[in-house]
Amino acid sequence: MGNTATQISGYEKSIFEAHASNGHLITHDIYRRGSGAPVVLLQELPGIGQETLSLADELVNAGFEVVMPHLFGPLGKTSIGGNLVRVMCLRKEFRLMTSDRSSPIADWVRLLCREIRDQRGVKGVGVIGMCLTGNFAIQLIGDDSVLAAVASQPAMPFFKQGELHMSSDDIEQSRNALDVKGPMRVLRFENDPMCTQEKSKCVHRAFNDDGNIRVQEITLPGRGHSVLTLDFVDQSGHPTREALDNVIQYFSSHLSPPI
């Protein structure tokens, strides 16, 4: 990644609103940049900081259009503590501690993916979810509008690492979709305290229990957390660099640009 990321002022801004399954109308700003096959980049808890903007640059430079919803927090900098408070206040959108069902915001992202697919005239989009949005990527791969998904350090539900932030119906739908679309990617550090080995085992039990690899996990050495952003090291041969290269190759093989 370059030393200076393209700032948010270099993005095209729009607004997307849609009703979640609970009936709540959700509205957020959307930032777009680049051309090519669309990839929806979902922010992690620290926010859309410089590291996330650098990740977006990597995707744009690889030939993708980045579509980045602004879900919470300041733009251009990280705010872990402040954003945690903000998300806790967005109870109609996020359910941080809930297992066996997802957050309403995941419904909104699904509708966003469908709109992007239809607007761009493509077969489907890619999705990257990170940290508290990581589980959303696992759920969204079950939708026809999503052809490829990456869950980086999926941490929700917090304090329940042996459970998933999605319903049994969601799991079944994603399993069936992955049988057709091929394995998605999950990224995590081996000793991540927020996305633990217990979480890894939970994902494998849910998706790879019958010997069919629906979720391909890329495990990196160390105790980091944010594989593609805060803990990313842009050096040839570094595990995080190799993980990002794998993600780009995965998207390139599964997504097609607009005609």
Name each region found by the language model.
Residues M1-I259:
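N-terminal cap/leader regions of alpha/beta-hydrolase-fold enzymes
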